[in-house]
Amino acid sequence: MHFAFPPRKSSYSHPYAARSSRSPFLRRTRLPQYLGLFALGAFCLYFLFLRSPAPTKPPPGTPGAVVVTVIDPDLSKSYIEAIKDNRKDYAARHGYVTFFPNTTDYALGDSPKSWSTIPALRHAMTLYPHTSYFFYLTSTALIMNPSLSLHSHIMAPTRLESLTLTDIPVVPPDSVIKTFSHLRGDRIDFVMTQDQEGLAGGSLILRSGEWAKYFLDAWFDPLYRSYNFQKAEAHALEHIVQWHGTILAKLALVPQRILNSYTRDQSGRTDGIYVEGDFVANFHGCQRDENRNCEEEMQPLL
């Protein structure tokens, strides 16, 4: 007997019916693809954040470091020249170069002009792509011991490991996020200090590389610039260091007098106060305090 339509199959599927033999085959063929994608992702993370920079020989004439100071054109001409001469003298002793952009060189919108520090460093990296170190120093500071090179004084791996402050709150006094208990000196790309208020960004060193570019781009994110941080880029830096492990993993905090001695400290602390022979004297706060004059305070040390 013939039917007009094929007989209807039962909609009931036996609970123990064998699955199609194609499914395990497809899983087996796709597994290498998944593993490959995972391996590629892991490699990218390693390349960006964990791998030590491959040693390459820079072109002849490449400076060992760039000293970056951002200049406010509203400062007096004599003050600006004194700051520049201080950096130029230091740079000439060690084969470094200087870079003095103005705060007005970068489009900051409504953000405070102190944000210009970040694009200035990024700009310097573009101008000197093969240079090892970028040393940012605020215009309220002087280099007081020009005999100290960045490498021997701080950045040599064994020296840097001995200086690094480990397992301490990133933002004093009671941040729950602490510095790593151990970092290899050759994997540290960002060096700075703390003061009694938090991270002290007036003097810092960046090692050139893809990570440094990533860090500066992250720090200069429009979201942070538009957010009303009380201390602008300083508080933005504290935020990203504490909550982005890829940045904390490259950061070394060193004792304040190694890189950023203050000439006075209103908190009463003395461990960060400038002593003759220190690398840097920072007249921290002299621009914000109406009762202080940076140029007058610096004059005895120029």
Predicted segments, located by residue:
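N-terminal anchoring/stem segment of glycosyltransferases
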Residues: 16-130
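Eukaryotic short linear interaction motifs
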Residues: 75-77, 99, 107-109, 142-145, ...
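Catalytic core and acceptor-binding pocket of nucleotide-sugar-dependent glycosyltransferases
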Residues: 119, 197-302
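Short coil/turn segments at secondary-structure boundaries
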Residues: 78-83, 103, 148-150, 204-205, ...
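Active-site-proximal beta-strand/loop segments in catalytic clefts of secreted hydrolases
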Residues: 70-72, 101-104, 137-139, 193-195, ...
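Loop/turn elements at helix/coil->beta-strand transitions in domains of secreted/extracellular proteins
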Residues: 63-64, 94-97, 130-133, 139-140, ...
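GT-A fold catalytic core of metal-dependent nucleotide-sugar glycosyltransferases
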Residues: 113-192, 198, 203-209, 213
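Fungal intrinsically disordered, low-complexity polar regions
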Residues: 1-25, 33-43, 54-64, 153-178
